[in-house]
């Protein structure tokens, strides 16, 4: 006879690795990086909430700190929990979930009892029941697990909302105004549904269901029963009347709900805007002639006439040619004028008859004046500047000695040997001879012809000597005064540097010859 089978020895500790790995696959997960704020009980409840059958939480120290082993009833439940828990952010920590390896199975929890394992392997019907029970407890089958609603949905529950009305919409608007979160969620929903934004002007009111509510038609008059039909008993009459009422109410409700759903699904029709063609009216000549004046914007400002704003065109005519002769008349003219004055005085002493006799005829004829002399006088007057700079303006436009020391142009400044010719440098590009004549003309007496001829200005505008000038003055005294007053005067944004010229030769006088300064 065969020897009786000996029972397998089972240790008191954890079972072997073969007991942890069922033939269908592994069902133990290793959960890492659990939050330290949670206690061991809270960690165990968390993993059991995701369908774990048994949980073992390890200590908060060592290599496997803040970790836990979770055993699930089967491989599918373990895979589903892994997809839900892996990379889940919890209290600032990101969970890392993986299947437990063979080297880590020493720390895995032991099954609660051997009888449960035998029951699962022997009875597949009970295993299916457990699956169904776990299915109701998992997170995916809940109503809103993110908000804490984990109980399952009722499959028999259906919602049927009434169509929108003015009172319902008013209540919704009041709720939007009182609950800011609800208002924000409504805006999010409108954005997702690509609805127009409500931030613009008020849109047209869509057609409401209340406007299309059908009025109940009056019931048709009941015809009297024919005498041929025998009257029914009272019980049959009551049953038939109840059945007809039930059928009529059901049909009315169905028709009413169908109409409500059709109206709810209808989109609001926007009113069509009819564009009116504007016919431009032709203006008549009368209207164009009598154009009304535009009212003034304010009564404070007077109305300006075109003559006040624009220059009136002057009539073109024969222009008179005039010669502006200076007061300095030649000696010949003075002698003639003195003779005429003496003659007039003598005529006053003569009787009136003699004076009248002298005035009879074409009058007196004077000799023709010398035109060359008048033209020379005119040229001399053009060369003379009408105005010269004053001493106050020179002092005001000069820079101080402290500023001269800071500028590089005046660092190695030396006035030079005194003579009647000065040298000016550091001139701006826009400087012209008339500007220098305006400044240095105050040191020349233009009434003297010799001094006026000796006054000479040569401005260099090109080449290596650009921005420099030589000014010839009548004498050394005038040159020294000009150097003292004009040195450092700012002309067109640049201070002038005035020095005595090295070789000073005055301009030769054609009448008197060479003169030494």
From Swiss-Prot:
The Basic and acidic residues compositionally biased stretches are: 115-130
Q: What is its main location?
A: nucleus
Q: Where in the cell is it found?
A: Nucleus
Keyword list (alphabetical) reads: Nucleus, Phosphoprotein, Repeat, RNA-binding
Extent of Acidic residues compositional bias = 231-252
Where is there biased composition of kind Pro residues? 217-230
Annotated GO biological process: mRNA splicing, via spliceosome
Q: What does this protein do?
A: Participates in pre-mRNA U12-dependent splicing, performed by the minor spliceosome which removes U12-type introns. U12-type introns comprises less than 1% of all non-coding sequences. Binds to the 3'-stem-loop of m(7)G-capped U12 snRNA.
Subunit and partners: Component of the U11/U12 snRNPs that are part of the U12-type spliceosome. Found in a complex with m(7)G-capped U12 snRNA. Interacts with PDCD7.
The entry's protein name is RNA-binding region-containing protein 3
Native organism is Pongo abelii (Sumatran orangutan)
Q: What is the lineage of its organism?
A: Eukaryota, Metazoa, Chordata, Craniata, Vertebrata
Could you tell me the gene encoding this protein?
RNPC3
